[in-house]
């Protein structure tokens, strides 16, 4: 048996015991920890085959596990591949063909990969979004103000190829070990391209002299650091539902040089906070389906049930209901999701304008599927005076 067949058999074994209950990356880590004889090349090849299986999304569900792995590998690969040459040489001979033609050869339809086109937000191209699952997204960093030259110089010195998408946004190879090259969070933050573009809405608030800011679903603090960099000297309050989440945030803030901020630990789906009419800006990067990021974790698409959307919508509405009273008259709510579903995006904006008399200033689909980046939604709303 060739090493390529061994890789395929290992991938089949891993996938047959995986049920989607934990992130697949963590599952792989456990498998490799239990099989220490596998070297770096073995781990890379097996991981690639497993992810090829998931990148087909909902397409080819009738195929056996090994057939689906190879079909995914064929669709996700554009250059001559040694494994395909050994196992499916007839496919390897046409490896550079158009991806839609490849799918047709396999009897698959591009729209089967992500079959929820009717649920998409307006303006998202269903076919292009489906095709984006067949490529691994890039790694992006946002250079923090004043560090542009030093970060680029360090990357060049380390021999890292990068693409400059804007003066502060760089796209890099996924395997780049940034922590060995730059001061992460101090000089630059790892932040997806679309997530960085939320800063354009924050920039519109610079003339408003925003002072008191509440990042109500702060997670690891990426939007808070962005707000600090864009808006300058703000009084920052961060909240999340668990102490462990804020522990990671505090570590990141320390690395970023952010020392002055307030913390709250509360479940905003159950209750609000006591500070009514306090904040000039509330950033609500709410829990969501994460569907705009699934090209990074394609197992989530494979296991996704459309009925789960409503669960997220109800959670989002509960959080929004409990935070609006903390917004000052004349203040702003920045609503953000990494979802592509209309119910989590535009429909929640309508919920806010209808039930809380908020005014919509701007909403935008941050398309990343044509840039090997995440796709997100952001809306800036304001609370009228009086």
Where are the regions that the model predicts?
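S-adenosylmethionine
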Residues: 1-386
């Amino acid at each position: 048996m060739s090493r390529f067949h061994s890789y395929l058999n290992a991938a089949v074994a891993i996938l047959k015991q995986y049920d989607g209950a934990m992130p697949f990356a963590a599952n792989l880590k456990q498998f490799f920890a239990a099989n220490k004889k596998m070297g770096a090349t073995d781990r890379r090849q097996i991981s690639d085959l497993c992810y090829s299986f998931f990148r087909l999304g909902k397409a080819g569900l009738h195929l056996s596990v090994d057939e689906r792995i190879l079909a995914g590998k064929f669709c996700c690969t554009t250059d001559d591949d040694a494994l395909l040459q050994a196992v499916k040489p007839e496919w390897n001979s046409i490896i550079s063909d158009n991806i839609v033609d490849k799918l047709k050869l396999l009897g698959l339809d591009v729209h089967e990969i992500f079959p929820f086109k009717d649920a998409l937000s307006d303006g998202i191209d269903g076919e292009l979004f489906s095709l984006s699952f067949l490529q691994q997204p890039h790694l992006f960093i946002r250079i923090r103000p004043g560090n542009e030259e030093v970060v680029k110089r360090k990357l060049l010195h380390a021999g890292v190829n990068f693409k400059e998408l804007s003066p502060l946004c760089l796209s890099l190879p996924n395997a780049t070990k940034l922590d060995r090259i730059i001061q992460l969070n101090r000089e630059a933050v790892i932040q997806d391209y679309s997530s960085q573009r939320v800063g354009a809405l924050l920039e519109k608030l610079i003339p408003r002299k925003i002072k008191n800011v509440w990042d109500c679903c702060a997670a690891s603090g990426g939007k808070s650091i962005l707000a600090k960099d864009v808006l300058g000297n703000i009084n920052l309050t961060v909240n999340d539902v668990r102490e462990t989440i804020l522990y990671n945030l505090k570590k990141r803030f320390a690395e970023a040089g952010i020392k002055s901020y307030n913390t709250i630990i509360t479940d905003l789906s159950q209750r609000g906070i006591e500070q009514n009419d306090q904040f000039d800006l509330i950033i609500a990067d709410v829990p969501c389906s994460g569907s705009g990021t699934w090209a990074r974790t394609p197992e989530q698409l494979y296991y996704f049930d459309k009925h789960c959307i409503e669960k997220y919508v109800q959670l989002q509405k509960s959080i929004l209901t409990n935070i609006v009273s903390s917004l000052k008259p004349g203040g702003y709510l920045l609503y953000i999701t990494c979802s592509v579903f209309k119910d989590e995006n535009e429909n929640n904006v309508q919920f806010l304008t209808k039930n809380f008399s908020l005014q919509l200033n701007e909403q935008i689909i941050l398309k990343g599927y044509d840039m090997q980046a995440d796709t997100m939604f952001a809306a800036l709303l304001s609370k009228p005076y009086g």
